[in-house]
Amino acid sequence: MTGFLTILSLSLAALSVTNAAQILSVPQGAEVVPNGYIVVMKDDTSEQDFSSHRAWVSNIHHNVTRRGLNGEGVKETYDFDNVRGYSGIFDKDTIKDISNDPKVAFVEPDAIIKQHVFVQQRKAPWGLSRLSNRRGGRNYVFDSTAGNGVWAYVVDSGVDIHHSEFQGRAIWGSNLVDNKNSDGTGHGTHVAGTIAGKTYGIAKKAKIIAVKVLDSEGKGPTSGIIAGINWSIKHARQHGKLQKSVLNMSLGGSYSAGLNHVTARAIKAGMFVSVSAGNDNINSNNNSPASERSVCTIAASTENDGKASFSNWGPAVDLYAPGHNILSARPGGGSQTMSGTSMAAPHAAGVAAYLIAKEGIPGDRVCLRLKQLSRPTIRNPGPDTTSRLLYNGSGR
């Protein structure tokens, strides 16, 4: 009998290892959070199983700290639309134990995400006129609904909500970085101004909600971006705004299965999600969240309808939008000009908010509508890349 029990125990242990969740690697050269990991549970994990798993992880972590090993344990928990997971700081033995739980889908290192922006000299805001005129022009033509009733979640470096561009339509939502409700880089304020500013914005009546996930250097961990998406979905659901919301992420980093997975769930929940393609002049399939096929991935165009030299390209790109020398709001008042796919993505978010208000279409169907309205005018867009440029359908 003893021999039988020994064999059974060994068999169960072998089965556990065989069924262990994959611990994903990050691309070479990616900047990672030391000992930081993201854990994603399988879709069929119940709330009770998830709770039990977290209690078990806490117990493991408690034993680790009792042994004098460093580790912070679980920091953020994600639980929405059957997406359950968490992130934290763990030693390698703990991560190995976690990956052996059959309820875990995968584990991946927590990597650093960065904003996609360059600061350039001041110039006129040509992007607005370009997206409302088939053949160019200097006037911005739009319907008076102008995004009224639509909420825009700016998952970024924060927003100067008191800037006159927002006319009281901007609020702080969540700060996942620090205790400073401010924009340390100017990036998020510029992005928000393009989406819904009174002068520089497309959807001039939309509401801006600041979700701070990037620090004063324009960086943040993947786990923090996921937490920002999680918060945005829950907030929109609580206020009955899921299908009348857009979420913009002008940021990106190395490929992340976890970030792509959670971003896709935001769209499945009913939101429109625009993301920047990246500024490395490479295939955007290598980046996240740009490589997630269900999002609207936006590359950057120039004033003469060319591909911006820095813009990423590839089959993951859905549209081009103005991204070179874009004038918009800056913290503290006034304006500044920036370039990058970070500037292209909010043009798409703004037109998305505009169309949701004007045509009444739900957020998760807007990317298709944007592609239907777009025009094939981009010259030399890149290998296996669309030539279609964002257009608001004004008829001009």
From Swiss-Prot:
One Gene Ontology biological process: proteolysis
Official protein name in the record: Subtilisin-like protease 5
Glycoprotein recorded as keyword: yes
Physiological role: Secreted subtilisin-like serine protease with keratinolytic activity that contributes to pathogenicity.
Propeptide position ranges: 21-116
Top-level taxon of origin: Eukaryota
Matching PROSITE patterns: SUBTILASE, SUBTILASE_ASP, SUBTILASE_HIS, SUBTILASE_SER
Family to which the UniProt record says this protein belongs: Belongs to the peptidase S8 family.
Glycosylation site positions: 230, 248, 392
Keywords assigned: Glycoprotein, Hydrolase, Protease, Secreted, Serine protease, Signal, Virulence, Zymogen
MF terms in GO: serine-type endopeptidase activity
Gene: SUB5
